[in-house]
Amino acid sequence: MQDIIKNILTRQEDENTKIISLLATSDVHGFYMPWDYSLDMKTDRGGLTRVSSVVKQIREENPNTMLIDCGDLIQGNSMDVFLNRDKFPATEVVNYMGYEILNMGNHEFNFGMETLINIISNYKGVPMMGNLYKENGYRALNGYYIKHFGKIKIGFISLNTPMVRHFEEKRGNLKGYQVTDADIELEKLLEEIPEVDALIGVFHMGDTNENNIANTGTMDLLYNVKRAER
């Protein structure tokens, strides 16, 4: 980790370049503090408190730093005991740390849509998932986001694993909403997003297909979507 930080901090800009530090977390699963709440004991797993220290150091050296989360943030480590509170630990932490994007993961849907919407309603950044739709046919969350670093425009496209349907529909956790196929939505989003200098996929998906289902892994998805070649 120290070598990675040193690498980031020692890079230098010149008149033809701009150094942008993109920092991302994923699968935090309720470990905001280095504490296992189910066992009520300290854990070496780490947590967002440790991440926060690294982020602060990098931001001090490079103001062109962006922090995002790629999904599975709110579930785990006994965080379900806070579901009916006015304030949920995850949103309090990510607001404090200055996360600009929260991508939805499959576990964000474990508690149902009403709970999820209530939790992210207190988030100050951009909640994203390009393949989540309401019954009226409109996207429930942002599918893409553009961040400006001076004259440079960085685009972010968001997708979640379509396996959410298999995990959550039978439980009734998607009531009133639909999760669509990632390949179809990626084609749409590539058409919709304005021209940018760089395009980054924020996908809560593995590299390879899940259960041998096509386009549930990023490698298969990008190979099959022709516009992704651009």
Regions found by a protein language model. Give the residues of each.
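Acidic, metal/ion-coordinating pockets
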Residues: M1-R230
